[in-house]
Amino acid sequence: MLFRSEDLARRIAEKLDVPSADVFDVSKLTEALVNEYDVLVLGSSTWGAGELQDDWYDGVKVLKKCDLSHKSVALFGCGDSDSYSDTFCDAIGILYEDLKDTHCKFCGATDTAGYTFDSSIAVVDGKFVGLPLDEVNEDSKTDERISAWAEQVKQEIS
């Protein structure tokens, strides 16, 4: 799944008109790097029983040390809505929970319509907290979902 997240990050960056030089692996995240940007687009695959990818545990610590109160944060994740229907894209829900007290402005909430899953902690107030993507079962929907989400995020941060 790690390579799927990286591929999705690059595809999303392209739709957001973000140069590839501004796409970073979370393992390289530093306070100085975070402070360079007003908008953060954060993505993670969901591992095991609805867990973050391991590098994110340190990444969250870095983010919590930063002043995010004037930053916009958009989340995306990849998951498997068939095999892990009860923890679909939980990783972005974990990131949301970990960062909601930083006073950042979350953007890019996505309607649950069109998704088939049983449960996800990434659903808050009836919407996903970011963009969930399923490259295992619904890869034919990914490009359209990314395009629509990127336009939404652009509008929300302008």
Descriptions of predicted regions:
Residues 19-30:
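A short beta-strand-loop structural module common to alpha/beta enzyme folds
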Residues 7, 11, 15, 19, ...:
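FMN-binding flavodoxin-like domain, especially the glycine-rich phosphate-binding loop
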